[in-house]
Design a protein with these regions (language model features):
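Short beta->alpha connector loops at strand-helix junctions that form conserved
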Residues: 26, 44-49
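Hydrophobic/aromatic ligand-binding patch that stacks against planar heteroaromatic rings
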Residues: 35-36, 87, 182
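Phosphate-binding glycine-rich loop
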Residues: 1-21, 35-37, 45-47, 110
Length: 328
């Protein structure tokens, strides 16, 4: 929200204007899209790479009029950030990174969320670390820092270096998005353990994949998405694509998993262009341009990936449930 409104704020010397276009992958989340639309900007949707579920950077050249990119690091994974950064620089564009599901992921030793003009993070309870609610936005320049600092607190200049000690001096528009001291303390205490939690999630992911592939009934029922080869991922969840020859079993099977204690979710919201809210805004697009995004919706789901070590009993329970798909 703050990053989006900062991009169009008149206080920012170089900024976007109402009507400017921005690129966003069709597999996205509502809070990645709607703040930019609320700023008067126009979305230009782009398909995803079926191997990573993230924005397909090879399609960027087709979006020649866009002034910004909202790049989403899905479930801890990433596009090729060097290619995206080079494209952004060559076109003098803005880049926002939605890093809400990828806290701690690194692309060639550089943290996701630090490539763009702004990086956004979520500390909701289901994420890598949690403060219960809220999140974080990072930026690169003093101008952007002071703008974000003011906008998060009603548009005050309170707390800024340029402040004239007037507690009620409103220098801009703004919101009330300040964290509580209590939630900040909870988040900071977990931040110290982030690297260990990332390692634990990776081990759990590897355990599940190996257990499934070595199951006596394994017959490539699922496809696991690929970590970008230049990425050291901080995994958010455990996504799967059901193979096409058994796709007709998906609905009944997911109902079975949920009723058995294995909670499932769509991969983000699937192809967001199918959401009812998009019809309200009459977005123009060709379905044939989003075949991978539709495949992610049709075949995909994900389950939780715990930070605590998965013991043998839980691992056996989970894999046995997942391997029952062909019985439906």
């Amino acid at each position: 929200l703050l990053a989006s409104f900062a991009l169009v704020n008149p206080k920012k010397k170089r900024r976007l204007k109402p009507g400017d276009e921005f690129i966003i992958p069709a597999v996205c989340w509502s809070t990645s899209l709607w703040p930019l639309v609320q700023c008067g900007l126009k979305p230009k949707f782009i398909d995803v790479d079926i191997n990573t579920y993230c924005l397909d950077e090879n399609l960027l050249d087709k979006k020649t009029n866009a002034k910004a990119i909202m790049n989403i690091h899905i479930l801890g994974n990433s596009s090729n950030m060097h290619k995206i950064s080079e494209f952004v620089k060559s076109k003098n564009m803005f880049l926002i990174e939605d890093t809400c599901e990828a806290l701690g992921s690194k692309f060639k030793s550089k943290y996701l969320g630090t490539f763009g003009d702004f990086g956004t993070f979520s500390f909701y309870y289901s994420h890598q670390i949690t403060s219960g609610e809220g999140g974080m936005v990072v930026c690169k320049t003093k101008e952007d820092y002071e703008l974000l600092h003011s906008m998060r607190s009603h548009g005050w200049d309170r707390g800024l270096r340029s402040s004239k000690k007037n507690s009620f001096n409103f220098i801009n528009s703004g919101f009330n998005l300040r964290p509580l001291d209590l939630t900040a303390a909870i988040g900071l205490s977990q931040l110290k353990r982030l690297n260990n939690m990332i390692m634990s999630r990776k081990k759990n992911r590897d355990l599940i994949i190996n257990k499934l592939r070595n199951h006596s009934n394994w017959n490539n029922q699922y496809t696991f998405f690929n970590e970008n080869k230049n990425l050291k991922a901080s995994w958010f969840g455990f996504p799967l694509l059901i193979n096409k020859n058994i796709l007709n079993k998906k609905r009944k099977f997911l109902n079975y998993l949920n009723s058995s204690g294995v909670e499932t979710r769509p991969i983000l919201s699937g192809n967001f262009l199918n959401q009812p809210s998009c019809k309200l805004f009459n977005f123009k697009y060709n379905k044939k341009d989003f075949l991978n995004s539709q495949e992610v919706e049709d075949r995909g789901f994900f389950i939780g990936l715990p930070t605590d070590h998965i013991d043998k009993n839980l691992l056996n329970f989970l894999t046995e449930k997942l391997m029952k798909i062909e019985k439906f």
